[in-house]
Amino acid sequence: MSNKQTKFIWVPAILVVILLGMIFYSAWQRRETKVSTSKNKITVVASLDSYGEMAEAVLGKQGTVTSIINKPNMDPHEYEPTANVAKQYQKADVIVSNGGGFDNWSLNFAKQNKTAKTINLARLYNYKDGTSGGNEHFWYKTDLTTRLTNQLAVKYSQLMPAKKTYFEKNAKNYQKKAEKLVDLQNQVKTRLNGKKLLATEPVFDNTLLALGADMQDQQFARAVEEGDDPTPSDVREWQELIKRGQIAAVIDNPQATGKLAKQGVDYAKAHDVPIVEARETKPAQTSYITWQMKQLNALNEALQE
């Protein structure tokens, strides 16, 4: 008799424990859902601050953006990422890389993050590394502001479908700001079309060629970019073009350190050829649009000399 009573006592007790467990689990699950919702933000990592600026503009208040190359004196080619940078890439929801052999460290980190949405500018522009005449400086593409912000809106919307309209609106707002840059590009194009230019490096070529410039002695520029000395033939061609008065301006990357590049600029100055600076990295405390407009305005003025 006592065994039966014990069984009757234990059965309700077990049911109570199970019921309480279900209640506590349900409450915990609701709490976890609430916490995850409150932290439902997008984390973005961009290899270059120019791309990071656009990523932040489109993202708005829906997350955070970290740009790795974020100082003008940082060399993307020689950059060695730290362990902290590796962690940032691992935690990222969206990764923006230049590609094209420019920031292989960023592409490698992106491959290791199996869940992140990725944007590779080289793929966006159907660029193949090693292609003759190819140029991996995609931030100088004249349609970059439209192409990248639209792509960012797509990636963000895949992560936050409810915010799709918000992201698209932010992209359009940035493109609206960039209209003054597009207007200036068109203005420069009328003066630049068909003009012969020299460059110490092909950094600015994506813009110049799109606006109709006739780039000369390109072997000189490519050699400097690769860290090599231009050949004596390249140097002679540089000097002959200048002596014959065929060059409207010389585009100089002030970050280039080659001796022959400096001599080429000095030779142009001695023959009263205008020098226009075009950097590889964005100056500090300057927006991408302002930076691009400053360089184009300098070119526009040089073409009027």
Pin down the residues of each PLM region.
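Extracytoplasmic metal-acquisition and chelation regions
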Residues: 2-305
